[in-house]
Amino acid sequence: MSPDALLVSAQRAGWQPPDSLTAVLLPAAQARPVYRALDPGTLVLDDLPDATGVLLVPDADRSHLLRQLSGRTAVVGPARPWTHASASYARAVRARLLSPDIRDTEGHLPELVLSADADAFADLRARALAPLRALPAATAGRLEGTLRAWLLHQGRRDEVAAALFVHPQTVRYRMAQLRELFPDLASPDRVLELTLAVGLRPS
């Protein structure tokens, strides 16, 4: 249905559409109690077959909404134009599948992007980290962790050491190993590929 057709339907129903809607997923039993504390224009779905409740909150002040949901098992999607509220709902669903600990999807965009195509991500990891495959699993794991910290801390050895709880000399030794395994480690294309490959820890 086109946005114009949706608007006509909303007007016929006597509903004034907001500029945006934010989807909130939470247990169905919590939907009504939370709804009573929110904007009265909030739409409630609490009769879905999987016992999930959905709130569609109009023009939400995100920080206020998150405070209102404190202590609740809730996932908050992004604000979207009301005609695209399904996109907010879809992201909240994906976030909940990714981790039960996610509350605000806006705080987990890198994980959501990297997990959007699990098959492509697995292929990327396999290709990018192929030089580690010949090593014992424990060694490969240590080197991958070091590589991840080195990339995320932009090669600052003391910060890498602090992140890994090791001595800076240990980082120096491991990075020497990694440079042998990845001779093109200074290549921007290689850095991008490796950063993506190690950016999300595999489940």
Question: What is each of the regions a protein language model found here?
Answer:
Residues 2-203:
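Cytosolic nucleotide-utilizing catalytic cores of signal-transduction proteins
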